[in-house]
Amino acid sequence: MSIVPKETVEVIAQSIGITNLLPEAALMLAPDVEYRVREIMQEAIKCMRHSKRTTLTASDVDGALNLRNVEPIYGFASGGPFRFRKAIGHRDLFYTDDREVDFKDVIEAPLPKAPLDTEIVCHWLAIEGVQPAIPENAPLEVIRAPAETKIHEQKDGPLIDVRLPVKHVLSRELQLYFQKIAELAMSKSNPPLYKEALVSLASDSGLHPLVPYFTNFIADEVSNGLNDFRLLFNLMHIVRSLLQNPHIHIEPYLHQLMPSVVTCLVSRKLGNRFADNHWELRDFAANLVSLICKRYGTVYITLQSRLTRTLVNALLDPKKALTQHYGAIQGLAALGHTVVRLLILSNLEPYLSLLEPELNAEKQKNQMKIYEAWRVYGALLRAAGLCIHGRLKIFPPLPSPSPSFLHKGKGKGKIISTDPHKRKLSVDSSENQSPQKRLITMDGPDGVHSQDQSGSAPMQVDNPVENDNPPQNSVQPSSSEQASDANESESRNGKVKESGRSRAITMKAILDQIWKDDLDSGRLLVKLHELYGDRILPFIPSTEMSVFL
């Protein structure tokens, strides 16, 4: 017997317009209706379980109907419970209480808000143990540890370990230390005490918790105090002390320190008084830039490339002030001779042509502009001079051979070329002479006697001259022994020749590179002398000066 009565089938038939349904037909349709309802409900329960829910909804039934290729029932998508009312005049007849909706109200109703797009937003949970006060982070007052009594009361349920966020709490001593350093940097009233504070800042081992506070303090004061020259100098001294402290791990804070240092290097104006020596501040900042790149350039590979790009853009921009050009030149010069040779000397001639009108007192009437131009000119001269000085020191000129060597070489030696086809040593000597030393020299460019960089004398090889006639009392070997000895001597001679050939090729390549670099240095020296005249001569060492003159 079906749980669906035949009266239900008759009511459903009447609701769809079938009025002549026989009772026998309704009785036979009831079991089939029950089977179909059970089938749909089983599929709906599967949809509910796949959705990780325990409450069956109308959407689950719609999903089950779609799986059975049956058109879903419309008008029952509400998430709330259905309300049924009893039909008047019928004891067991119920219907859903549908609220009548006017089309005018539906049309005039405002549109709902568009749903937000799915996105991922990153924010800091904690910075150096301190939770930032941003809307994404819950305030610390809301998260509290549960009371011990409540934990003991919940013996049946699982215990939950609530961990509070780590709060970065500075000790009272560190707070006073930071405040004192900041006051000394701002007040500038006690220079001896400030120097002692800088020494402590560069050597104390317990100052790492203060590094984020110092970096923020330096960044804020540099951006707001460009007119205070003494404050900027004090801040740069703090940066140097932090860099010199071996107990501070400052790599994560370089991205905050570098903008402040570069600002003090290439800013248009530092200080608001004529007596402020901002040139010294720029030199100090250039030394800091060099220190940072040398110490942390291997850790941050893009650090020096980004810095040089910034400095080159400041140098080659004609709209920048001469003070900015000076800072860029000092910063590039502090990065080494290679940077100077590639970035400054390659642009030296066109830049000097643009700087020349500023150096002329007849064309430039502003004395301050003339002074700034001469400062830039001096910075370029110093950078180029130190570059050529270091270049010439790497490749010193070869000393001339001694007179005794030249005198002996007239009768006893020859200059041997490094050509692979000319590897044998020839010695012009009489057969009755005792064993002697043969001189081996290698030809450099233009027929000059080439030696190693250390300037040592030509290499000497002891090779005794063998007599053609053996002694009378010597024992003559057999024919087989003579053949084996001949083979061994030939193999040894072949190995010696191969090793000598490889050494000669290597020496030739080294000497060719040395002569090429030396020739480039000579050309560079001539070019700098054409641009600067006799002003470049004090940077040339005395030995190279004599060769150049």
UniProtKB/Swiss-Prot annotation:
One of its GO terms (cellular component) is SLIK (SAGA-like) complex. GO terms for molecular function: protein heterodimerization activity; RNA polymerase II general transcription initiation factor activity. Keywords: Activator, Nucleus, Phosphoprotein, Transcription, Transcription regulation. GO terms for biological process: pollen tube growth; transcription initiation at RNA polymerase II promoter. Residues 5-78 form the Histone-fold domain. Residues 399-501 are annotated as: Disordered. Residues 489-501 have a biased composition (Basic and acidic residues). Expressed in roots, leaves, inflorescences and siliques. Disruption phenotype: Lethal when homozygote. Reduced pollen tube growth when heterozygote. TAFs are components of the transcription factor IID (TFIID) complex that is essential for mediating regulation of RNA polymerase transcription. Required for proper pollen function. May stabilize the interaction of TFIID with selected promoters. Not redundant with TAF6B. PANTHER family: TRANSCRIPTION INITIATION FACTOR TFIID SUBUNIT 6. Belongs to the TAF6 family. This is Transcription initiation factor TFIID subunit 6. It comes from Arabidopsis thaliana. The lineage of its organism: Eukaryota, Viridiplantae, Streptophyta, Embryophyta, Tracheophyta.
